[in-house]
Structure formats: structure tokens, C-alpha cells
Regions:
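C-terminal regions of RecA-like/P-loop NTPase motor modules
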Residues: 1-20, 32, 36, 40-42, ...
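The Walker A/P-loop phosphate-binding site
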Residues: 10-118, 123-125
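Conserved catalytic network of the ASCE P-loop NTPase/AAA+ motor domain
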Residues: 57, 97-102, 129-131, 158-160, ...
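Short, solvent-exposed loop/turn segments at secondary-structure junctions
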Residues: 58, 174-178, 208-215
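Conserved inter-motif catalytic segment of the P-loop NTP-binding fold
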Residues: 99-182, 262-264, 271-275
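Phosphate-binding/switch region of NTP-binding enzymes
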Residues: 64-66, 70, 74-75, 185-273
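Conserved, well-folded catalytic cores of nucleic-acid-processing
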Residues: 83, 87, 125-128, 174-177, ...
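Alpha-helical scaffold elements adjacent to nucleotide-binding pockets in ATP/GTP-utilizing enzyme cores
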Residues: 79-80, 117-125, 152, 186-190, ...
Length: 277
């Protein structure tokens, strides 16, 4: 069978050093390769009589929060970011914990909210921490088009040193069409490359289809397939749960939180019993 090649692809391969790529991609089965360092954990698990932190996110990878509209995904993000920073955040989410985070920069990109609401959310994060954290950098991207949002993120990565955690709330605003397969795959490839090349943890947020738990569009499918962890955010009668929807790691225990009269989310309890592995 004759295979027709795209001439544009042939032109690209002429300038590509595949011997170097092959060397970089080769897996030596005799080499000791350490596990990716944990960036965020939720609770602990037992393994062979010892307790270990249960990872949600690792440096060099990306994770995703999914949920229905107004299900408090952004509140969950606030709990995660404040817990990554530390300080008094353990009083709000005692089972969420940041790792390797000393003096790390946190980039908090919001594509949906107005500057007023984005600022209010950023202040709530610092209220949970208990002090102004100089390395927390929130950005409001609502007025930008999707290309400029991607451009700004690239600028952040290239010009801001020592980033540990980056959030993109919401990732669907970085594409023109969430059902364009090529465009969505390209964006997910960016997430994988950014997280690896800069050795950071990237958190994303996506909506789910009405009446189900599947993330919206081709973008949702691509993100959930490649993400290290997918966390489902659900709210019923004022109580919000974070559930391990998909993960390459050990499944963490689900947790619940409520939003207090002060506007801050606070964990209620572990829903699940401790898991043993």
C-alpha cells in the first residue's frame, strides 16, 4: 500500500536531529529513575506498614479539576493554592499539603472572572495563608484573546524564575474551539512540555457536560487522558466534595468542604476511610 506523506512534515524532518531525540527518549531499564517529586498531596496511605503522603500533583506534570458550572471549582483551587503555600492554610485544609515549596513562585491565571472577582479570590487565598506571600502572583486574563493568553503564559514561564505551581482557570479559554481535535491536542502537548521543561506542577480547570462527569469537548477528553490526576468537584446542598476521578498514582481519600460566612472554604472531614496499599 502506498503511503502519502504530508510534504510539510517531510520538510520539518529534514531539520530535525532524530539521533538526539532518540537518545533523549530512550529508557535504560538498568538505570535508577527516581519518582517525580510530589508537589501536592491529599492525606496519607499505608504501604508495607509505613505511612506516605498521597500525591495529587507532581513536579513535571499537570493535573485537572473538573466539575459542573458553579460547583466551586475555583474554591477548590483556592484551597489547593493556599495549602501549597502553607502558613495557616492547614487550619482550613488539614489534609492538603505542599511539598518542595520553599520560596516557590505560584502563578494563578484566571481567564473567566473580572479583575474585581479575581482580586477578591486572590485575597481570600492570602487570608487562608494568614499573611501576604510575596511569591504569589495572580493574573486576570479575561479580556485577552486565546492566543494572547497562551503568549502571556509563555512569557511567564520564560521570565519568572523559580515557579513551583501554575494554575490555569480555565483551560478551555486557551483554544478557539474545544471540539477542534488538532487545536486541543496541541494545547495538551503544551501542558506536557511546559510542566516537564520547567519542572513545575500545572493545575487546570474544566467544565463537565451537563448530567455527566465527562469533561467538555475534545479538549476535555485530551486533558483527562494525559493528566496525572483528575479531581471531580461536586456540590450538593452547600457541601462540596473533592473526589479522585482518575489518577496515575494511589487514589487519595475524598474530602468535603463548606464555604463559611467569611467566604473562605474549609474542610469538613475525610469522606473515605484510609486506604492500604
Amino acid at each position: 500500500m502506498k503511503i502519502e506523506y504530508n510534504p510539510d512534515l517531510l520538510e520539518q524532518t529534514d531539520e530535525t536531529d532524530y539521533s538526539k531525540i532518540a537518545k533523549d527518549c530512550f529508557i535504560d531499564v538498568d538505570e535508577t529513575i527516581d519518582m517525580q517529586p510530589i508537589a501536592l498531596s491529599l492525606g496519607k496511605h499505608e504501604h508495607k506498614g509505613q505511612m506516605y503522603d498521597t500525591p495529587i500533583a507532581s513536579y513535571g506534570d499537570f493535573f485537572c479539576l473538573i466539575g459542573a458550572s458553579k460547583s466551586r471549582k475555583t474554591y477548590a483551587k483556592k484551597g489547593i493554592i493556599s495549602s501549597y503555600i502553607g502558613g495557616n492554610a492547614s487550619s482550613y485544609f488539614p489534609d492538603l499539603k505542599g511539598h518542595g515549596n520553599k520560596d516557590k513562585v505560584i502563578i494563578d491565571n484566571d481567564t473567566e472572572q473580572s479583575k474585581f472577582h479575581a482580586q477578591r479570590g486572590a485575597r481570600q487565598i492570602l487570608n487562608m495563608v494568614g499573611s501576604k506571600y510575596p511569591y504569589y502572583k495572580p493574573y486576570e486574563m479575561r479580556s485577552l484573546n486565546y492566543k494572547d493568553r497562551i503568549g502571556l503564559i509563555k512569557w511567564q514561564l520564560e521570565n519568572i524564575d523559580n515557579i513551583g505551581l501554575m494554575f490555569i482557570d480555565g483551560i478551555a479559554d486557551l483554544v478557539r474551539n474545544v471540539n477542534d481535535l488538532d487545536e486541543c491536542n496541541d494545547l495538551v502537548q503544551m501542558l506536557m512540555s511546559w510542566s516537564k521543561d520547567y519542572n513545575i506542577a500545572i493545575g487546570t480547570i474544566l467544565h463537565i457536560n451537563y448530567g455527566g462527569i465527562k469533561a467538555t469537548g475534545h479538549l476535555g477528553s485530551a486533558v483527562t487522558k494525559k493528566a496525572e490526576t483528575v479531581v471531580l468537584v461536586e456540590t450538593t446542598e452547600g457541601i462540596t466534595s473533592l473526589k479522585a476521578n482518575l489518577t496515575r498514582n494511589i487514589s487519595f481519600n475524598d474530602i468535603e468542604f463548606e464555604v463559611g460566612t467569611d467566604g473562605l472554604p474549609k474542610q469538613n472531614s475525610l469522606i473515605s476511610s484510609d486506604k492500604n496499599y
